[in-house]
A protein has these predicted regions:
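Terminal, low-complexity, charged helical segments
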Residues: 16, 29, 34, 83, ...
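Short, aromatic-rich amphipathic segments at membrane interfaces
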Residues: 111-134, 143-148
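Short, Lys/Arg-rich cytosolic juxtamembrane segment immediately N-terminal
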Residues: 10-21, 122-130
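N-terminal acidic, proline/glycine-rich, low-complexity intrinsically disordered segments
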Residues: 1-7
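Juxtamembrane interface at the cytosolic side of transmembrane helices
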Residues: 7, 13-16, 20, 138-180
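Transmembrane signal-anchor/signal-peptide helices with a preference for the extracytoplasmic
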Residues: 32-55
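Long, solvent-exposed extracytoplasmic domains/loops
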Residues: 52-118
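Polytopic alpha-helical membrane proteins, predominantly small-molecule transporters/carriers
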Residues: 58, 128, 162-163
Length: 180
């Protein structure tokens, strides 16, 4: 004769959920911590690259002003037929335009500033994904806490599903595998 399974009491169900939830909440919290760490690093990189790019553009503008002044001096030297000064100014103007030896010509500065901006823009793309991921992890933790209090397996599985979405969003934030 088959024994009828008695339904679990509330305290037995609560113990069962607490056993599972303890491990799950630890994993979700660890993922949330990693997500926050990466997000903060990305925020710092965006800020640093913005500052560096702005500094480089300011240096570029200073070189442009100096080049304009050198061009005016060149015109004056040509008008006064001072060939020595004219040659000196031509060399200076060429160095302001491009100076590969020091990397401080306008051409090199523009390339450096654009590279910094491109890196900043690439890192900035991950920001929303990491934010949404963090929100999903937090919601997963809240649902898991509610599952423990309500002794509800559907809430438990719902928290796992929401956290899985958080992991998917975090992977998009890290690798940008979807071209959105």
């Amino acid at each position: 004769m088959a024994e009828d399974k008695k339904p679990l009491s509330r305290s037995e169900r609560e113990a069962k959920i607490k056993d599972k939830a303890g491990w799950v909440i630890t994993v979700i919290a660890a993922l949330l911590a990693v997500n926050t760490y990466i997000s903060n690093g990305n925020s710092s990189k965006v800020l640093n690259n913005t500052i560096k790019a702005n500094d480089t553009w300011a240096f570029y503008q200073a070189k442009s002003i100096k080049q304009t002044l050198a061009e005016q001096s060149l015109d004056d030297a040509i008008a006064r037929k001072d060939t020595a000064k004219a040659e000196k100014m031509k060399a200076k103007i060429e160095r302001y335009e491009s100076d590969p030896a020091t990397g401080e010509g306008k051409k090199e500065l523009m390339a450096k500033a654009r590279a910094l901006e491109a890196e900043r823009d690439q890192v900035r793309k991950s920001g929303p994904w990491m934010t949404f991921s963090g929100m999903a992890y937090q919601l997963g933790i809240v649902l898991l806490s509610a599952a423990i209090l309500a002794v509800s397996m559907p809430l438990f599985w719902g928290s796992i599903a929401v956290s899985a979405v958080g992991a998917l969003l975090m992977s998009q934030g890290i690798w940008l595998w979807l071209p959105i």
